[in-house]
C-alpha cells in the first residue's frame, strides 16, 4: 500500500461565497477557481473578463480560462502557499473593473420547425405561449457569448428571455 497526502484536500472550499465576496476553490494542486458572487449576468462577466486580463501577466501563471462568471487559473508549479494565492486572487478581483470585450456579430440560422424543433411543443406547454410567440421572443433577442465551451465553436450564450427558459 502506498500512503499519500494531499495538503490541498482540506482547502477544497477555501473562501465561501457571500453577497459581495468572490468564492475561491482549489481545483487540484496547481489550479484555483474564482467564482463571481451574485447573479449570472453581464456585470459579473465583465469583471471576470477584466480579472482575466489582469492575471494573464502573472509570471507564475501557466494559463487562465474565463468561464461563465468564473475564472480558472492554472499555475506553472504547485504554489507553496495556497492561502497567499487565494488572497492574491481576491485582491485582484476587488480591483477588477468592468471591461467590455470587442467582438463581432455572428448570425446563427435557427430552424424552428420539423425534425429540428422537437422541444418546441414542450416549451409551449411549459411557458403557456404559442409556437409563434416563442419563435418571435427567441428571434428578437441578441445573445452574447460569455465563454467558450470545450467543443470547437461552442459558445455559452447569455441573453435568453426568461419567458422561454426551459430547465
Q: What are these model-predicted stretches?
A:
Residues 1-167:
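Conserved "landmark" site that anchors the functional core of diverse proteins
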Amino acid at each position: 500500500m502506498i500512503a499519500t497526502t494531499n495538503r490541498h484536500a482540506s482547502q477544497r472550499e477555501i473562501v465561501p461565497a457571500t453577497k459581495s465576496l468572490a468564492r475561491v476553490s482549489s481545483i487540484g494542486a496547481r489550479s484555483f477557481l474564482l467564482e463571481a458572487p451574485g447573479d449570472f449576468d453581464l456585470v459579473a462577466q465583465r469583471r471576470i473578463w477584466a480579472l482575466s486580463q489582469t492575471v494573464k501577466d502573472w509570471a507564475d501563471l501557466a494559463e487562465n480560462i474565463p468561464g461563465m462568471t468564473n475564472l480558472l487559473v492554472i499555475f506553472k508549479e504547485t504554489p507553496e502557499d495556497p492561502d497567499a494565492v487565494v488572497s492574491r486572487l481576491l485582491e485582484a478581483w476587488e480591483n477588477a473593473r468592468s471591461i467590455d470585450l470587442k467582438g463581432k456579430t455572428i448570425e446563427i440560422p435557427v430552424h424552428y420547425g420539423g425534425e429540428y424543433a422537437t422541444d418546441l411543443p414542450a416549451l409551449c406547454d411549459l411557458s403557456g405561449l404559442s409556437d409563434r410567440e416563442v419563435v418571435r421572443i427567441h428571434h428578437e433577442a441578441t445573445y452574447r457569448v460569455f465563454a467558450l465551451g470545450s467543443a470547437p465553436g461552442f459558445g455559452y450564450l447569455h441573453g435568453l428571455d426568461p419567458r422561454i427558459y426551459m430547465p
